Regions:
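N-terminal auxiliary segments of SAM/dcSAM-dependent transferases
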Residues: 1-27
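Conserved class I S-adenosyl-L-methionine
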Residues: 61-70
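Short alpha-helix immediately C-terminal to the canonical SAM-binding loop
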Residues: 95-97
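Conserved SAM-binding loop of SAM-dependent methyltransferases across substrates and taxa
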Residues: 71-83
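Conserved SAM/SAH-binding beta-strand->alpha-helix loop
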Residues: 91-92
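Conserved SAM-binding strand-loop segment of SAM-dependent methyltransferases
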Residues: 102-113
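A conserved beta-strand element that flanks and buttresses the S-adenosyl-L-methionine
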Residues: 123
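Conserved SAM-binding loop and adjacent beta-strand
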Residues: 21-53
């Protein structure tokens, strides 16, 4: 992913986290398609998760690696269910938000920095 886009995404997350309820990301594709994405979606409650992600959470086991954890949305839900969770994201602003939201084990890292067998479940939630 483009480092500039990663930074801009993080700025939008921080804007919302710091009180800008109208923060929006504009998704622009190479084919010219554009679509607004309200940043509030990255801060929704577990009751608002899509059914496939609810099912994925129910099927987690043991120590969970939440890849691309963003704002900690799913990490927090897993922690509340008693799981040990390691949340990783390559976006430093997202990592800062997760720390402030009380995700217990947060790392600014890429999945390729981990070796096989360290986790019981690897989640890539959206």
């Amino acid at each position: 992913m483009n480092p500039k886009a990663i930074k801009l995404h993080g700025v939008a997350l921080l804007d919302y986290f710091n009180g800008d309820e109208n923060a929006t990301i504009i998704i622009r594709r190479d084919d010219g398609y554009e679509s607004p994405l309200p940043v509030r979606l990255f801060f929704r409650e577990p009751s608002e998760f899509i059914p496939t992600n609810k099912a994925a959470i129910e099927n987690c086991r043991g120590h969970v690696l939440d890849v691309g954890a963003g704002t900690g949305l799913y990490s927090l839900a897993l922690q509340q269910k008693g799981f040990t969770v390691t949340a990783i994201d390559i976006n430093q602003q997202a990592v800062e938000i997760m720390i402030q939201r009380s995700v217990k084990d947060v790392q600014c890292a890429d999945i390729f920095e981990y070796s096989e067998g360290q986790f019981d479940t690897i989640g890539l939630f959206r």
